[in-house]
Amino acid sequence: MVTNEKTVKTSVVSSCTANSCEIRDAFMMIGGKWKSMILYVLASQGVVRFNQLKKTVSGISQKMLTQQLRELERDGLIKRQVFPEVPPHVEYSMTELGLSLGPIYQAVHKWEQENLMAIYKCRRQYDDALI
C-alpha cells in the first residue's frame, strides 16, 4: 500500500475524537520539555543513576525529574532498579519498548536536519511581520 501525505492526514484525523486521539497520546508519552531529554540520556548512556540524570538533564528540578521518570516507568519505556543500600542506590535504563523508539527519534532528527533552516526562515519572517 502506498501511503501519501493525504492518506496520513486522513488516518490521523479519523482516529482522533474528543476523548481519544492515539497520536496525541503517543506524543504525551514521549514529548514535553523533559521526557525527550531523559530518554535520549538513557538511550545513549545505558544505565544511569538518578543524580547523574539530574546533572545531565540541565535545569530540571528533582521533583520534575522524579515525576517524569515515574510517568516513563508507568508507560513501560524505562526500568527503575532499586538497590537496598545506605544511601539508596537507584538506577534507570531503557526497556525494550523504550529502545523501540530509536527509529522514531532518528526519523525526527533527520527531519530536523533537513528542515531546520526553513524553520528558522519562517520564524524570522513571522517575527519580522510582528514588528
Predicted regions and their residues:
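Recognition helices and adjacent regulatory flanks at domain boundaries
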Residues: 1, 5-19
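N-terminal helix-turn-helix DNA-binding core of bacterial DNA-binding proteins
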Residues: 17-64, 84, 91
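Hydrophobic alpha-helical core bundles mediating ligand binding, dimerization, or RNAP-core interactions
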Residues: 23, 27, 102-112, 116-119, ...
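Basic amphipathic alpha-helical segments that dock to polyanions
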Residues: 65, 69-72
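Glycine-centered, phosphate/nucleic-acid-interacting loop/turn motifs that mediate DNA/RNA or nucleotide
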Residues: 76
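Short beta-strand "wing" residues that participate in macromolecule-binding interfaces
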Residues: 80
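Basic, amphipathic "hinge/linker" alpha-helix immediately C-terminal to the N-terminal HTH DNA-binding motif
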Residues: 84-107
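Exposed, interaction-prone assembly regions rather than primary DNA-binding/catalytic cores
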Residues: 121-131
